[in-house]
A protein has these predicted regions:
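Beta-alpha junction/loop-to-helix N-cap segments that form part of ligand/metal-binding clefts
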Residues: 153-158, 168, 172-233
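Periplasmic-binding protein-like
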Residues: 195-208, 225-228, 264-269, 317-332, ...
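Segments of small-molecule ligand-sensing domains
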Residues: 389-466
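Bacterial signal peptide processing site
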Residues: 27-30
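Short beta-strand elements at the ligand-binding edges of bilobed clamshell
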Residues: 233-256, 365-377
């Protein structure tokens, strides 16, 4: 084959072209990766996050006030945004415990388990491994109750409910012993010391709010505690609290109405201490979630003619979407016809759990039909390990009337001693108890979602899809 000068020129041109393409190819293979933008958080969420970063460094009332500010900021965020921003928080973020509690209170799932290495954690000690359903009770249980003193009447149903759950369980059970707190601070500390000295590896109680604070403040909890009330002191690491507080009724009622887009509420309330606490919690939660208390009308033991006051409330700009009845059953029954005459009979009506104790004489004429109220799940559905509420009431005085709520509370206290580890470590761990669905937040507080019921004549019936 011949090779001339013309061919050499083409070869040089081709080589130059290949070199240029090669250089260009090398230049374009370098890929610059830019970091993805951080998710944009709701302004209130970002403000709450800033407060949470400093929360652990605070103490006393400053810490309490900071926690309240965080909760109020989160309360004003809608469900979808709260869930989205919660999922964006990195592991270990101090805001997650607050956000998780807000999600649980709204009946929403957690994006991941609580970060148990921080504010609160559970230690099973030397308990045998858990069963497949999470059952892992302590080895020896000490129960602190006021078997004497002003709270002894309440302690009886709690004790009987606890023992009903204990003896219904056929698997391994702890040794159990009861210690009288005498409803005093000194008696509580002495009872705790006796339980620990006797070998208890878990302590249940005390029942009084002041006694819970005394124990949590003592700095002597060598054995963890599940307190049966909620005081002003948060549970120490490893301990927890479970309560049936009036504040829970108020907060649950507010969530119930907000979920049903009924933000403008007329409040009817009597003046006892429990009612005042429920109404205060209702107002705070409703306002934090964007609602308004249109008016609050005080009710005496025998309500008179409220027509003028009801008419004034109805005629306010924006009207009334719902009525919150923080009343005893007889008061609610007496007012029901007046609500109808004022044009409020067709509005959403929600009451506190007091309505669950209405007698058949108050409900038989259907005047209370349609009023929603939080109740023990046991009253409207079967609970494993317990006979029906009606059957138990026919056999046990401590499971009748108002005592039935405390009986169910005692039963759930037993469940919590056995399933607390599962609740602590599973993102959506829960126990279907006699008082409702039980979960635990990132601070060691048991969060209870009640069953919602209404009356159909003399019978309490469950409300489907009724949670907040």
């Amino acid at each position: 084959m011949s090779w001339n000068r013309k061919d050499a020129g083409w070869a040089r041109l081709l080589l130059a072209l290949l070199l240029a393409l090669s250089a260009a190819g090398c230049a374009t293979t370098q890929v610059v990766t830019r970091p993805s933008a951080a998710p944009r958080l709701a302004p209130a969420f970002a403000e709450a996050a800033a407060l949470a970063r400093n929360h652990a460094a605070l103490a006393g009332q400053a810490r309490v006030d900071n926690g309240i500010r965080i909760e109020r900021l989160l309360a004003g965020i809608d469900d979808a945004t709260l869930a989205r921003d919660a999922a964006a928080l990195p592991a270990g973020d101090p805001l997650y415990d607050f956000v998780g509690r807000a999600l649980l209170n709204r009946g929403l799932p957690l994006p991941r388990p609580f970060d148990r290495g921080g504010n609160w954690r559970f230690d099973a000690g030397n308990r045998p491994p858990a069963d497949s359903d999470g059952y892992r009770p302590p080895m020896q249980l000490g129960v602190l109750l006021p078997l004497s003193g002003s709270l002894s009447t309440a302690a009886g149903p709690v004790r009987d409910g606890l023992l009903a759950g204990y003896y219904a369980e056929q698997r391994r059970r702890p040794d159990i012993a009861f210690y009288d707190t005498a409803d005093t601070a000194g008696g509580t500390l002495a009872a705790y010391d006796k339980a620990v000295a006797a070998g208890a590896d878990y302590v249940l109680g005390p029942l009084g709010r002041d006694e819970v604070d005394t124990l949590f403040r003592s700095g002597r909890l060598t054995v963890p505690v599940l307190a049966l009330n909620r005081g002003n002191m948060p549970p120490p690491p490893g301990s927890a609290s479970f309560s049936l507080a009036p504040e829970d009724d108020g907060s649950a009622a507010a969530e119930y109405l907000i979920a049903r887009k009924a933000p403008r509420v007329l409040v009817l309330a009597d003046g006892d201490d429990g009612t005042r606490r429920a109404v205060a919690a209702f107002r705070e939660q409703l306002q934090a979630r964007g609602g308004t208390v249109v008016a609050e009308i005080g009710i005496t033991s025998e309500p008179g003619d409220l027509a003028p006051a009801l008419a004034t409330a109805v005629q306010k700009d924006g009207g009334v979407d719902a009525v919150f009845l923080a009343l005893k059953p007889a008061q609610a029954r007496a007012l029901a016809p007046q609500l109808v005459l004022a044009g409020l009979g067709g509005k959403l009506r929600v009451a506190t759990s007091q309505l669950a104790s209405a007698s058949s004489e108050l409900t038989k004429d259907h005047a209370l039909d349609g009023i929603a109220f939080p109740s023990e799940a046991w009253a409207v559905r079967n609970v494993t390990g317990l006979p029906s509420a009606a059957s138990a009431a026919s056999q046990l005085p401590n499971a009748r009337g108002g005592a039935a709520k405390l009986f169910a509370f005692g039963y759930d206290a037993w469940l919590l001693t056995a399933y607390l580890e599962r609740l602590a470590n599973d993102a959506n761990g829960k126990v279907e108890g006699a008082t409702g669905t039980l979960r635990i937040d990132g601070f060691g507080n048991v969060v209870r979602t009640p069953a919602w019921s209404t009356y159909s004549g003399a019978t309490a019936v469950p409300l489907g899809n009724a949670g907040g």
